[in-house]
A protein has these predicted regions:
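PLP-dependent class I/II
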Residues: 1-145
């Protein structure tokens, strides 16, 4: 781990030496005036509503097991049945207007699990979530052996 940390620090140094001073000052004012905390509260309310709608839609369709942080976040980590290939599901769902992120890229090389995927909700309106999960369920059914 120490060697990795050293390499990461060296890379960071090449990518970003110092944020511009005016950007640092603007952010400092934004935070000092309480705007950052207010924005976090707004985001928590906004995303919390979407999260609840997504949770209800997933519960209704009972397709997959899933996990999501209880402290925020913008996506659910989904585990499909063993036969499910999340890459094929991503392609089929995209044809139906639903985007998911296959999970194998999140696993260490050689340990990829093809039935996992990430389902994000930060850019989808609450009114579209239930329909999207219905479409995702239909996409799964087309792949069922």
């Amino acid at each position: 781990p120490e060697q990795l940390i050293e390499q990461a620090r060296a890379l960071r140094h090449l990518i970003l030496r110092h944020p511009p001073g005016h950007a640092q000052r603007t952010l400092a004012y934004f935070m000092a005036l309480g705007h950052y905390d207010a924005q976090i509260r707004r985001l928590r309310r906004h995303l919390g509503g979407r999260r609840q709608v997504l949770q209800a839609a997933l519960d209704q369709h009972q397709l997959f097991s899933h996990t999501a942080s209880h402290f925020g976040g913008t996506s659910f980590w989904m585990k499909g049945p063993d036969w499910l290939d999340s890459r094929a599901l991503a392609d089929r769902a995209a044809e139906m207007g639903v985007l998911i992120e296959p999970g194998e890229v999140f696993f260490q090389s050689g340990a990829a699990q093809h039935n996992y995927f990430r389902l994000a909700y930060s850019s989808i309106g609450e009114s579209q979530i239930a329909e999207g999960i219905g479409r995702l369920a239909a996409a799964v059914e087309t792949l069922r052996p």
